[in-house]
Each structure stands twice: as structure tokens, then as C-alpha cells.
């Protein structure tokens, strides 16, 4: 199995090599940030806790960027795995090869990030380093094992045309568990029942991870429902087409907007907290982390737009050939972004304020709600604006897809 993996690595394309470097670098940066965030759990002051939370938040968009890097050359990887299946490899062999490939990249990057943390924190706590390295490596193994899930079912590509999976009721449980762990760790802090401050940090980190997946799965409900509502009330062909396209595949939009929704959620929650305690250096670092998360989510949206244009290029080319102007097709992209992002950002902003207010019900004052609501509205607007700007920036991709399909 190792010999086969080495042979496949020697035959990797340039896109595959770029993807491998991005995955390893992302694993290294995520390991360093999480180790640093856990080490700050020892500080009793509010600034240290907020700094640790900001660093933990920085690891979330980096994880999303690693996921998008895995998607950059997914078609090439699936062709290689499909060739192995046709050559006689079993589904288990394909899964093991994918797990070994993803695990090797993750363990190399996480060891590099752990070594960097040890060098820069010789006097700081070190017990969390092997735990974080193991968790990051495990994530790489699971991601690699899932890479060939299409070709395991059908090496000829039949599974790629399967019906898009819709939202499920059990997706809500994941979101509830994430909110519960995050609130528990944030409220208890140093008095956490298990392992004290380290247990609190682990609870917050686990809550963030579950929130990331829970928001991705749960927002599918909101996006599909709002798209259906917008389609029934559409007053133009552009709005109707955009609503129907979003309704046809809400999970893809939920996946692309996951980091955006988390950015809006934590931005609104931070604003609700600032209204009571004032603005500190820890809040400044938290805002920087949110800006980085928003920029990273914009990259994820660009990748999503490119993938969608590749899938819909024939339909768009047929519309263009029938006389629909390119500007109108670009308007469809913008309307899609608004339909998908608006409900997600609004619900995320309201949820962020609600979590803080409900957690601090005994001490929270009514006059603080003014700043909290203003910050929530601003964060929701920034999230929708980011999606719209990405859609406007994707118009050259639309033009290229139309030209390519016309020549073909």
C-alpha cells in the first residue's frame, strides 16, 4: 500500500502538488494557533481569555481554507482513485489510500506547527501539543478517507450524478451540541468541572468545531426555505432563475457560507459583550480574527462560484445563445448570493446577540441592547456584502465559462 502511495505521489500533477502544500501549511498554522489558544486558558484576566478565543477563531477559517484546498484538485484525485478501482482495487483499498495520503500531509504539517509552538513557547505549557497534533492528524485521516467516497460506490462516475441530499432533522442536534459546549466552556472558564481551565478551553474548541459543522448542515434548511419563498414572489426571470438554482442545491451554498455565518455570529456576540464591559485589547484581536475569517470565507465563496459555473456552463451558454445578455446572467449570480446569504447572516447575527444576553441575563442591562443591535445589523450587512462582492468578482469566470462552452 505504501509503495502504491509513493507511485501515485510521483505522478501527481501541478494542481495536486499545490493542494498538498496548502493542506500541510494549513495543518501547521492550525496546530500552532490551537496550541497557543489552549495555553492562554491559564490566564485569569478577561483579556487573556479573549485573546485565546481570537486565536481559536483564526483556526476555524484556516480549517475551511484547507477544506477548499482539498477541493481544488478533487477531480484529478477521483480520476486516479477510479483508475485503481477499475484495475482491481477494493473499496477498502481506496479508502485506506485516501486516509494515508490525507494523514501523511496532516501529520507533517501538524508536527511542523507543534515544533514552531515549542520553540516560541519554551517557558509555556506544553502538554497540549501532542493532543492537538493527534487531533489535527486524525482530521486529515478522516478527510482523506472521505475523498474517494464517490468512486467507492461507482468508479465510472455514476455516483456523481446522484440526487443532492437535502436537510435532515438530526442536523439540528449537532448545532445544539455545539452551542451547549461553547456556552458551558465560556461560562465556567477556570471552574470547569473537568481539568479546570484546560477543560474549559477544550469545551470551547469542541463547541466551535461542532458549531462549524452544525451551522453548515442547519443553514441548509434556512437557505432552501428562503429560496422557495423568494421564488414564489419573484417579479423577474433573473430572480426566479436565481431562486430555483439556490433551492436546487442549498447544501453547497450552506457549505460555502459556513465560515461567513460563524463570523457574523461571533461578531454580533462580541458586540453584545462589548456593550457591557467596554472595548479592550482582547476585543481588538477578536475583531482581527473575524476579519481574517471573513477574508478566508470569501476565498471559499470564489471556489464555490467557480464550481457552480463549471456545472451550469452548458445551461448558461444555452441561455446566452438564445439571446439572454451576459449582464443578465451576471445578475443571476448576484441574486443567488443575496438569496443564500441574507437568511444565514440575519439568523447568525440574532443568535450571536441572543447567546450573550441569555448567558448574562442577571447582569445584562436594557440600555446595552442599542450597541448590541447596531453591531449585529452591521455584521449581517458585512456578511451579505461580502457574498455580493464575490458574485460581482465572479463575472469574469462567467465570461470565461461561456467562451469555453461556445468554442467546445
Per-range role (PLM):
Residues 98-99, 155, 333, 402:
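A general structural motif at alpha-helix termini
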Residues 27-45, 53-76, 91-124, 128, ...:
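Transmembrane-helix bundle segments that line or gate the permeation/cavity pathway
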Residues 133-162, 384-408:
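C-terminal membrane-exit region of the final transmembrane helix in multipass inner-membrane proteins
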